[in-house]
């Protein structure tokens, strides 16, 4: 089945039936809901489907769980698995996917205290750090995975990061005091660390002094463990390895031979774990006359020397991860950098067993966040693991605020069920919130969680280990069989340029493009997710990637694969914004009042009080270039104390308006934060702004920014200015009153210390409320620009849509009419095309900007030749002459008589007859002299896009853009052809065509000519389309195509379309 796009998923949701299905199918659907690509199998990476779970008492009266499991998709070949001792507490259910470690030579599988491991949902990879943190508090671990951005940066974290890097560099170079000093200074000058110092308002000198306190301990450790003459000189330790014989308790001398890897990234689908090992070291264990060599994980800690259970647990989990790459290290090392004290951490079966049980509990809590409500009942968020009562743990917990908030807003538990010591803390942490605030929080938590569990948003990285590269290449999101071709180049610290070629033959057809984020793995099983980065260049011969690790240490014969890193369903940022909105701060309180409580926005009475005298001439000159509604928008923004909404109807010069607004605000001395959801939307405004010599700073990764804007990026400016001090970085930030970034880029350190006078959010009507919130925390006033009568925020989950997730902040605040100004003069569509949208959507408010715009028609210099051909061959079909007539800007071609039935295949909807007609029309317009670049073809389903694209490729037609409505938002073409696709007798239309906003966008993309193609009888069943047909009929703009008309066009369509 082909991969579904966002819109196909909406269709499939609607068309799914409610018929009774076999039990096996129900269980398989449950498994697919969590991990759709899982293939059941035996072996090292076995995957079993749980068919039934029964709790029993054995002959000794102890509780056991008996699981009926299978590796057959049909539910055959059933096997019994018995969970004994502590494993019986694992929260496993029918429909779960599991992995079992142990001996399966004889049935049943038995997992008990002494043998085997049981992994619940192994394709959910959980970090070792999260599992270790759950030892003390499982609730904290779940909250940290859910509200990740709430774990804010601290001084200790920054010092720890710098010390890690200095140690990691030194172990590969030298621990000599002068070398350590040099490495420390180099590290402190790196821009990424300077940015964190800026965030925390720390001076470079105070950070340097604190870092230097640790350096003597680095040298001391190296002198003890690395630089000795004989093995007897190395420190003695008591290290018992599970494989040791009876002498296991005798002391041994430990020699750290060398560092083999730094920040080694390992993903383990066997154990459902992932992590980065600080340092992977080769160690010699000298015991008596024997020497054993082991490759082991070394974990670095910069805090208090505690040798705590969390620290030791983390090391033990890294020994499990290490088994994916090499033989079991059986132990690891814990090094406290403050003292240079190193502790051995044996990884015995008992410790690994208990940690994997915790991992299972954490996986269960993360996967089961929403109740699967009974039919007719609304979904609801489930309670998190219980609140603990441990004053010290809670006092320093970074998730304390979210813990209290979730308890009050979502769980709404009675005081008696909360530990007594925590009740006052929960009340104290949430007493500033009203019932309406808590309800807003819980509703958006639920909707975001539902959306994150939608099929398309839940695409994790599991295809890397579940699907061979050769198969995944068909989707265009993967390239396999790659080899390195040139020496790796170090671009800057932590970034390495790699070149790859296909081992045999050219690159396959791919959707990967420059700028795409990717994960690089080895083709062999043990080399999953070696590195992350992005595509720098790609063509049919080679691909160049900038990666976060140097892979030159791997053998030259290593085969690699590139997988696109999907970012669908990232709810960390919106949940973080939602959490911030509930904080007890002035900025959050103000936004709660405006957004949740609908406090009336306030305005200043007189423009003279905000317009500086020396800016009046500049502002007047800018206003001269604007029309009346645009000037009204400028005035409304300048007078606002809270917010303004600018409704940018189609073609009304939204980008020009925003550009003028930034220029005026800048002339008045105001600072401006310019944002939107996409990089392209931000850069479109900046491209226009740059022409007016307005200085700005563009935040974000350079490779995602338009080439002409890259010189304005922070990255490029830091490079050109050779910034190596905090003072110079502050100077850069303070010298740019206009800053631009995406809504997802607000975690940048600059925003921790800067508040802007105005924040402008473009495309605000397409942005989900919690995402749109992000930049608003950092401004005194905000301007939302959009049009809620065009595309809303895309929501895939039907329940989330029903609960209101598609309501943007723009739509929510539009009820305060005093804050709204409309742009109604448009410069895109001629009068006839505009009248369609006026009738359907805008109640006659749209008007043409000039007579030239109103009367503009398509230019077809060769139309005379085409007409001669038509009159010779098609005198019986007058519709053909009419449809190409420039003076007929709008035409609906009705296929009812043809007929043109739809096809549903491989989960997608297409209409081959419509596709053939579209290609015929396109080729004829090109013959008549229309440039292919001036033509756009729109269809609501990806299957139809592919059908049209295939037919175009097999014809003589040039490159014509074929895309969904969503991809055309904000853009236009001289000629637009729309294929509605749906044509059936049962009334099925799909969610897409019911959405009047999507229809509005489709009909407002054309400047000079709009051709609509579809079945009137099928489409008119739905109000938006019925309204469209009423208008088209009244204007006599519908042409009924004759029976079997597509066949009569075959000799023009060509043999390629007869298949």
Swiss-Prot record:
Provide the binding site for [4Fe-4S] cluster: 137, 394, 397, 403
> How is the cofactor bound, as the UniProt entry phrases it?
Binds 1 [4Fe-4S] cluster.
Q: Kindly list the GO molecular function terms attached to this UniProt entry.
A: 4 iron, 4 sulfur cluster binding; 5'-3' DNA helicase activity; 5'-flap endonuclease activity; ATP binding; ATP hydrolysis activity; DNA binding; metal ion binding; nuclease activity
Q: Which domain of life is it from?
A: Eukaryota
Summarize what the UniProt record says about post-translational modification.
Answer: Acetylated by EP300, leading to stimulate the 5'-3' endonuclease, the 5'-3' helicase and DNA-dependent ATPase activities, possibly by increasing DNA substrate affinity.
Keywords annotated in UniProt:
4Fe-4S, Acetylation, ATP-binding, DNA damage, DNA repair, DNA replication, DNA-binding, Endonuclease, Helicase, Hydrolase, Iron, Iron-sulfur, Metal-binding, Mitochondrion, Multifunctional enzyme, Nuclease, Nucleotide-binding, Nucleus
The EC code for this enzyme is 3.1.-.-, 3.6.4.12
Q: Where does ATP bind?
A: 648-655
Residue ranges for the region (Helicase activity) are 520-1059
Q: Where in the cell is it found?
A: Nucleus; Mitochondrion
Names of the cofactor(s)? [4Fe-4S] cluster
The UniProt entry lists the main location of this chain as: nucleus
Catalyses: ATP + H2O = ADP + phosphate + H(+)
What do the Gene Ontology cellular component annotations say? Answer: cytoplasm; mitochondrion; nucleus
- One example of a Gene Ontology biological process annotation: DNA replication
Q: Where is this region: Nuclease activity?
A: 82-519
Q: In the UniProt record, does the keyword Repeat occur?
A: no
Quote the InterPro entries the UniProt record gives.
Dna2/JHS1_DEXXQ-box (IPR026851), DNA2/NAM7-like (IPR045055), DNA2/NAM7-like_C (IPR041679), DNA2/NAM7_AAA_11 (IPR041677), DNA2_Rift (IPR048459), DNA_replication_fac_Dna2_N (IPR014808), P-loop_NTPase (IPR027417), PDDEXK-like_dom_sf (IPR011604)
Q: Which family does it belong to?
A: Belongs to the DNA2/NAM7 helicase family.
How is the quaternary structure described? Answer: Interacts with BLM and WDHD1.
Q: Give the protein's biological function.
A: Key enzyme involved in DNA replication and DNA repair in nucleus and mitochondrion. Involved in Okazaki fragments processing by cleaving long flaps that escape FEN1: flaps that are longer than 27 nucleotides are coated by replication protein A complex (RPA), leading to recruit DNA2 which cleaves the flap until it is too short to bind RPA and becomes a substrate for FEN1. Also involved in 5'-end resection of DNA during double-strand break (DSB) repair: recruited by BLM and mediates the cleavage of 5'-ssDNA, while the 3'-ssDNA cleavage is prevented by the presence of RPA.
Name of this chain's protein: DNA replication ATP-dependent helicase/nuclease DNA2
**High-level lineage:** Eukaryota, Metazoa, Chordata, Craniata, Vertebrata
